[in-house]
């Protein structure tokens, strides 16, 4: 093969391509991406294309050389050919839609076995990051000493496994995303008709019309077209 290509990033594929000296191209549409996989991103055979320019610059600054910014593409010809019926208009029309999931589990598990001091420390990071837009300082606040303490508490409670610094940073960033999404959807839900599509209905949402899942090729384009605004 000249190269192997995937949407999003697969560490297993990256490792195999590195072993056989084959270029691996990953077109990534999620953000933030998992920084716990840095060793795979740094393979000379790995080429990552990210739609998020800030994420791309961040990884380049972490000695990942083959990182490129590539805006998300679409196929207007295919999308414009999709028929919209009267039934579709009744089902999908709304003021605002959101398709996606909430990251609300991992940090809760970590926090549940920490003492009040470190719960407060992590909550302070979350609260402060939520008030600052355009600069991510989570990484600066998560020290090696803190990771050691968190792992000690895990082992005291009989939890197997070890937390890495990158995993904790990523988990906190996910929690920030979760909190922002819940706040925005609940705010908009007070003033307009909001449809939420996902495989699970969060208990933290109110005044929101939960619609279940939306299939990528048949339903999602209709959701986008019939929403006055789509929240990403």
Which residues does each PLM region occupy?
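Nucleotide-sugar donor-binding catalytic core of glycosyltransferases
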Residues: 62-232
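Extended catalytic core of nucleotide-activated donor transferases of GT-like folds
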Residues: 1-61, 78-84, 210-230
